[in-house]
Curated annotation (Swiss-Prot):
Cellular component aspect of the GO annotation: extracellular region; plasma membrane
Lineage: Bacteria, Bacillati, Cyanobacteriota, Cyanophyceae, Synechococcales
Protein name: UPF0182 protein sync_1321
Stored InterPro entries: UPF0182
Cellular localization per UniProt: Cell membrane
Organism: Synechococcus sp. (strain CC9311)
Length: 934
């Protein structure tokens, strides 16, 4: 009976992990299948299974060799190599143990990374060592296994098994690395030093290098455990001497050592490519000394190691000559490494430094060209712009469309107002406000700039007594609605105007008489429909809907309104098996006995839109914040529903730190290549995800399209109503600006001298000086062009406040993604934001007014200073907000404007512009001439 119970118990222990694995696979399959992408998940499983099988064959071969090598042979008992005694024996023990410990420590770390962050494995050596408890536990287990097997070969085999399991896990979880290496196409750009296509660095180099590292780790583990088993036999430890290896054992070690040398040779050969993305010289990539010293030395060392590997193998030639050849080859390999360490700094000081520009000039040109291409700076269209010194009425007429969209509301004051007036309940949150444009005036070409903020539900803000399991997962399941405000209008009380505000029966849709926008136009072009936000930016737990419990929908005054989810998202919970699998997946057995599930109940997982996209495409980087749009959806589209209007737009990026000759970012981030390759659209109600390729020429995304063709769609197939709201992501634009500060220069001599370096100017926001962030404007890049939606960044020379240029990113229609650099004349000083703000604050009347408000208990907040092109002039606009010191609402009180020759402060923009033109003020208008020599 006891034996039967023991057998059943062992079978149960094996069955439990099997059930967990099957449950997780089932839930994941259902999750992908809701997007009709079950094939993507199946392909990923097959890739991992294939990788694990390949790794298993390799580690299995190593284990069989080890077992064969350790098998005793009676006929060779007396054939021994020289004896190791004393310190030599101790040194061999120590070396073997250090190799064993090092390999298993690296295996443990890589296995942990493979489990939690598999797409970081290609640059694992640059990541900080994690000391979290899971890794610590694994390390303790590893050390225990080693100590347990120190003196027993049989037990030491457990460490071999542990390391082999780690390798299989690592190879399986690295499916993305291997897939991209096999699928990435050539870009057609060849780097000049080694003649390889740049796609080798983008996709293949990391896979080959990582594969060789894994081979080296497994071979080192196998050899060290085998040798340790021989070195630590009981007679050896008691005598502190090792009688030596038999001839068969010595010959058996040769193939293993040869493979180790081949792996080192391959890594050293690949290290030649690493010269292409070093950052040690004056620019990125290989310089003169790298090409003329390091490249030959590394090539020589690699070839020497490869030949040495073949010489180590058993051979019929004379052992004396082969021993001499081995010594010569080993000396060459070691000498090449030593010479690199010694000669490089010496030759740099003696040879390169005295004539650095002459020697490095062609390599500087390569670095400039590569960096500009890696960040798409080579596609910038440069336009000279010589603004007039004074604003004219003709400029106002030419720039009328720009004036109609001058932004007076910053995101932060608007969010502060929303949080006090529009959150309505403690658990609602406005986490972000996005500047966008909508066609609210059909008679005009340009679209109205607005700020749209989603009203999400924050589970963490629920009162403590309401944070029950049922409330968190069945009742409080979604946010509701959004607010929309014009950027250029305010109410009589100085608070923002709203096109859309409040919720439920109190929901208001308003036009704006001052902007000549009717309520009907707002209602038509910004439909609301079902504004429930089941998927959003805030982290949210899983939800179960619909159930017999009604979900909180929105408040109606003091009464709450309830509803049932009728969307298409989620994992079915109709059968008992599906519920068991779901409860195991979410690790919550309460789902089984809740008693409120219905046949159509579904489990909503990954409700954070970025996590949702990341789960489908883990190879994408998701930078920046998603933004919500509400658009009329045309009927007849297979993948969209005309009764659903709220969608999140998420920007997906492909990047690499191994693009030849490209520079890293100025802040030290290891990124040398970046593309905004994907635009993801996430339905805020139904949770559907669509991935559109926005950079079809990017070799990395083309490689992923080969692997998962069903996952991507061309950008042209995106509904027009959504395409009209695409924007150049500010997160990428900021990185391009960082690189442009130095790499706007294309002349190697000027680049080397550092005479023409730019910087991002600073401005005063509130009481704090901050860098001017990129801002959206609707403006004309040229008088001959229509106004368009731009992302703009002013630029000034290093250590000087005058404007040197603007970088503008275009987001409209056929010009999406184009970069335009407006260059100002260098011989005429153009005031920068910092100078204009200083002149504003130095104005006696303006500073006196600020002081009066301050003494009256209000805090003056100087908003973002905008510099916009207007006709043939520049217009500087700064909104002034007042806020009570103790959490009051920010109100738009004044607008300061300047054209560089005068500064005026008035109640509104139009009054300020008129004062600038006339050059005279009034009771509520301050005007002052500026000193042009400042």
């Amino acid at each position: 009976m006891a034996k039967i119970i023991w057998t059943i118990g062992r079978f149960g222990l094996l069955l439990i992990p099997l059930i967990v694995i099957i449950s997780r696979l089932q839930v994941e399959w259902y999750w992908f299948d809701q997007f009709e992408l079950g094939s993507v998940y199946g392909k990923r499983l097959l890739l991992q299974l294939g990788g694990a099988l390949f790794a298993f064959l390799f580690v299995g071969s190593c284990a069989l060799w080890r077992q064969s090598w350790l098998r005793p042979s009676e006929s060779e008992k007396n054939e021994r190599s020289p004896v190791l005694t004393g310190y030599r024996y101790g040194f061999c023990l120590l070396a073997c143990l250090l190799v064993l410990l090092s390999v298993l420590a690296i295996d443990t770390r890589l296995a942990w990374l493979a489990w939690i962050e598999p797409f970081s494995l290609s640059y694992w050596w640059s990541l900080p060592f994690s000391t979290g408890w899971p890794l610590l536990s694994l390390s303790i287990l590893m050390l225990t296994l080693i100590m347990f097997g120190l003196t027993r070969s049989r037990r030491l085999g457990l460490t071999q098994v542990y390391g082999s399991v780690c390798i299989c896990l690592i190879v399986a979880r690295s499916w993305g690395l291997w897939s991209l290496a096999f699928s990435i196409p050539n870009l057609g750009r060849v780097e000049p030093m080694l003649g390889s296509d740049v796609s080798f660095g983008l996709g293949r180099f990391s896979a080959i290098a990582f594969g060789l590292e894994l081979v080296l780790l497994q071979l080192s583990l196998t050899l060290s455990t085998a040798l340790w088993s021989r070195l630590t036999r009981s007679t050896c430890l008691s005598d502190w001497a090792f009688p030596g290896l038999t001839a068969r054992q010595r010959h058996g070690l040769r193939p293993g050592f040869a493979l180790v040398l081949m792996s080192f040779s391959g890594l050293m050969w690949l290290s030649r490519h690493q010269l292409l993305w070093t950052q040690d010289g004056i620019v990125a990539g290989a310089g003169w000394l790298d090409v003329h010293l390091l490249l030959p030395l590394r090539s020589l060392g690699s070839i020497a190691l490869l030949v040495l590997a073949f010489v180590v193998l058993p051979s019929p030639f004379s052992s004396v000559r082969r021993r001499q050849l081995r010594l010569i080859l080993a000396f060459i390999a070691i000498a090449s490494f030593g010479l690199e360490m010694v000669l490089f700094p010496l030759m740099h000081w003696l040879v390169v430094r005295p004539r650095e520009l002459q020697l490095e000039r062609p390599y500087i040109s390569r670095a400039i060209e590569a960096t500009r291409h890696a960040y798409q700076l080579d596609a910038i269209e440069t336009e000279p712009f010589d603004p007039s010194s004074r604003l004219s009425r003709e400029d106002l007429r030419d720039g009328a469309s720009t004036l109609r969209n001058i932004r007076l509301w910053d995101s932060q004051p608007l969010l502060a107002t929303n949080r006090q007036l529009q959150q309505l309940r403690v658990y609602y949150r406005f986490t972000n406000a996005a500047v966008d444009r909508y066609q609210l005036r059909p008679e005009l070409l340009e679209r109205q700039q607005v700020i749209l903020a989603a009203r999400e539900l924050d589970q963490a803000a629920l009162p403590k007594r309401s944070r029950t399991w049922q409330n968190r997962h069945f009742v409080f399941t979604h946010g509701f609605g959004f607010t929309m405000s014009p950027v250029n209008s305010r109410g009589a009380d100085g608070l923002p105007d709203y096109f859309i505000s409040d919720i439920g029966s109190s929901e208001r849709i308003n036009g704006n008489k001052a902007l000549d926008i009717s309520r009907a136009d707002v209602k038509k072009n910004v439909p609301i429909g079902r504004p429930a936000l089941y998927f959003g930016m805030l982290p949210s737990p899983y939800a179960v809907a619909p159930t017999q419990i009604e979900e909180f929908d929105h408040p109606e005054g003091d009464v709450n309104t309830y509803n049932h989810y009728s969307g298409r998202a989620g994992i079915p919970l109709a059968s008992f098996g599906q519920r068991i699998a779901a409860s195991i997946y979410i690790r919550d057995p309460r789902l089984l006995n809740t008693g409120v599930l219905k046949p159509d109940s579904r489990l909503l997982l990954r409700r954070d839109v970025k996590k949702r996209v990341k789960a489908l495409a883990p190879f994408l980087q998701l930078k920046g914040d998603p933004y919500l749009v509400s658009v009329p959806m045309e009927s007849g589209l297979d993948q969209y529903h005309d009764d659903q209007h709220q969608y999140w737009i998420v920007d997906g990026f492909t990047s690499s730190n191994t693009y030849p000759y490209a520079s890293t970012l100025p802040d030290g981030k290891e990124m040398r290549y970046l593309r905004n390759s994907v635009k993801a659209i996430v339905d805020a109600y139904n949770g559907t995800v669509h991935l559109y390729v926005s950079e079809p020429d990017d070799p990395m995304i083309r490689g992923w399209q080969k692997v998962f063709p069903e996952l991507f769609q061309p950008l042209e197939s995106m509904p027009t109503s959504l395409r009209q709201h695409l924007m150049v992501p500010s997160s990428m634009f900021e990185l391009q600006v960082q690189q442009l500060l130095r790499y706007h220069v294309t002349d190697p001599r000027i680049f080397y001298s550092g005479d023409d370096v730019w910087q991002v100017p600073k401005e005063l926001y509130g009481k704090t000086q901050i860098p001017v962030a990129p801002y959206h404007i609707t403006a004309q890049l040229k008088r001959s062009l229509d106004s368009e939606f731009l992302l703009l960044q002013p630029l000034t020379p290093l250590a000087r406040p005058n404007l040197s240029g603007w970088l503008a990113a275009r987001s409209d229609a056929d010009h999406y993604g184009e970069l335009v650099l407006l260059r100002f004349p260098s011989d005429v000083p153009i005031f920068g934001p910092e100078q204009i703000q200083a002149l504003i604050n130095q104005n006696p009347e303006i500073s006196q007014q600020f002081g009066l408000w301050d003494r009256a208990g209000s805090q003056v907040v100087q908003g973002n200073l905008l510099v916009v092109p207007l006709g043939n002039a520049l217009l500087y606009v700064e909104p002034i907000y007042l806020r009570a010191r103790r959490g009051g609402l920010p109100t738009l009180t004044r607008v300061v404007v300047s054209d560089g020759s005068r500064v005026a402060m008035a109640n509104d923009l139009n009054t300020g512009l008129e004062a600038l033109l006339q050059g005279s003020g009034s009771k509520d208008v301050v005007v002052q001439e500026l000193d042009q020599s400042s």
